[in-house]
Amino acid sequence: MKSFYIESRACVRVGDEESEWFAVEVGLRQGCVMSPWLFNIFIDGVVREVRARTLGRGVGMVGERGEELQVNQLLFADDTVLMADSEEKLRRVVCEFGKVCNRRKLKVNVNKSKVMVCNRRAQLENLDVRVEGERLEEVDDFKYLGGVITGDASIGMDVQQRVNGGMKVFGAVKSMWKVKSLSMKGKRAMYQGIVVPTALYGAETWGTSVRDRRRLDVMEMKCLRSMCGVNRRDRVRNEEVRRRVGIQETLSERMDRRVLSWYGHIERMDDDRLTKRIYKANARGARVRGRPKMAWMDGVKRAVEKRGVTVDRAKELAYDRSEWRAFVKYMTNDAA
C-alpha cells in the first residue's frame, strides 16, 4: 500500500489535453477506493491524540447510570466540531487540535472555522479563540452537515431554510406543472421525489413548534395548489386540493414519521453505544429561568400520542422493528 504513494505523480486533464506531470507529496489519491479508508485511519489518529491531551475539557454530562461523560468532538469525515463548557477550555482544545493537525501536515481552514456560544441569550460573547495565531470569527449560527445550528438552540432558522429550499426546487420545475401531457400521478411523483426530501432534510432531529409546523404545511399547500392550477381567489378548500393531487398526509405529518423512525432506531441501539448513552444522559448544571424550549422528545411525545399511545408504550413497541414500522406508517385522523 505504501508503494502507491512513493514518488506519486499526477496531471490535470481537460478534454483531450493534459497538463505537465507534477509530483504529489501530500494528500490522498482522488478517486481511489482506499482513500476514504486511509483518511479515516488518519483522522482517527488525530482525534485520539487530541482527546488524550485535553482530558476533562469537553461538555460534562451525567449518564443514565450516573457515570460521567465528556463530549468534546463531533466528527463527520473532515467536518469537525470542538466543544467545551468554558472559554478557557475551548481555547485549550482548539490550540491542541491545531498543533496536532499542524504536526501531521493537516491544514485547518481558519476562514471556514467559526466559534459559537450556546446559551438562551443567543448573543456574541467576544471570545478570543485562535488557531496558529489567527483569531476565529464568532457567530450566532452556522451550517453543519446541511443544517443550521443556532446559539439559542432554536430550530426555527433551520426549518425556514428547508422551507426556502423546498420552494426553490419547486420553482425550478414549476414549468412542468403546466404541461398538459404530464398526468397528476407524474406531478405527484416529482413533488414527492424532489420537493419533499429537500424540505424535510434532517427533520429526524427537529423539535418543532406549532409555528414551525405551520410553515411547512403552508409551503406544501402553495406547491399543491400550483400543481392543480388553482389559487386562493378560486376559493377551493385545502381538502379538495389534496383530493385532486392525491396527497392526504401533510408535510408536518411526514416530519413526525421521520422523527419516530429515528426514535425507534435509537431505542433499539445497544446501551453501550455512544449515541444511546448521550441520548439518555443529562447535561450538567441547572436549567435557566423561563419557559423551556421545545425539545426533541416533546415532538416524539406529540407524535405517539396522536397515534393513541403513551411514550412508555411506544418505547416497548420500538423494540419490534416490524411492529414499529407499522406504527410509524399509521395515519392519524388529522392526516387521513
Question: PLM ranges: what are they?
Answer:
Residues 222, 290, 326-329:
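Eukaryote-specific, cytoplasm-facing alpha-helical/coiled-coil scaffolding segments in long proteins
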Residues 1-250, 254-257, 273, 280, ...:
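Nucleotidyl polymerases of mobile genetic elements and RNA viruses
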Residues 322-336:
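C-terminal helix/juxtamembrane-tail motif
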Residues 316:
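C-terminal anion-handling pockets and recognition modules
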Residues 269:
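Residue-level signal for short amphipathic helical patches enriched in basic/charged
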